[in-house]
Regions:
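Short, polar loop motifs at secondary-structure junctions
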Residues: 1, 42-44, 140
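Short, small-residue-biased leader/transition segments that mark boundaries at the very start
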Residues: 2-7
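Catalytic core of the metallo-beta-lactamase
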Residues: 8-62
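Cap/insert and terminal regions of metallo-dependent hydrolase folds
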Residues: 50-141
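Long, positively charged, glycine-interspersed low-complexity recognition regions
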Residues: 141-147
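Catalytic phosphate/metal-binding cores of nucleic-acid and nucleotide-processing enzymes, i.e., regions
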Residues: 150
């Protein structure tokens, strides 16, 4: 590829909400992929985006599972509070998706799902039903076409 290809893409950082220093998400635009949202390590998505074609978004925990894990002694209360202040719950993820125009979205990829506090299958199925979009759960080796058109 030539040097001119560099100008065919844009990467725009945006602030997220996490307990780390200067957390960021990214809106990436490329002529082949269109608009791609990447948002993880945030308990809330403070921005909405136009022209999305593909989304990678954290869907870390289910509040009921998290609470049950505290009640049953699997995790301490302090960890529950940290999770709530630094990660996107299933319901907040769903709200963030619904706040955006999903008309042109081809893929939603759920990332950073907690093994102990989440339910990947329920998250995938619930978000697919609510959005009418193709939803994937990120896992090693997963390959997805991120073209801006589905074919």
């Amino acid at each position: 590829r030539g040097l001119g290809d560099v100008y065919k893409r844009q990467i725009i950082p945006f602030p997220t909400k996490h307990d780390s220093r200067e957390p960021l998400g990214f809106y990436v635009w490329h002529e082949e992929t269109g608009g791609v949202l990447f948002a993880t390590d945030t308990f809330y998505l403070p921005c909405t985006f136009a022209g999305l074609n593909n989304i990678l978004i954290e869907c870390n925990y289910d509040p009921d599972i998290l609470e049950r894990n505290v009640t049953e002694g699997y995790i301490p209360e302090v960890l529950k509070e940290r999770v709530r202040r630094s990660h996107l719950s299933y319901y907040t993820c769903l709200d963030a998706l619904k706040a955006n125009d999903l008309t042109r979205v081809n893929n939603i990829v759920l990332i950073h799902i907690s093994e102990g506090n989440g339910d990947a299958v329920a998250f995938r199925d619930g978000i697919a039903k609510a959005t009418g979009k193709t939803v994937h759960v990120a896992k090693p080796g997963l390959r997805i076409s991120f073209n801006k058109t589905p074919f």
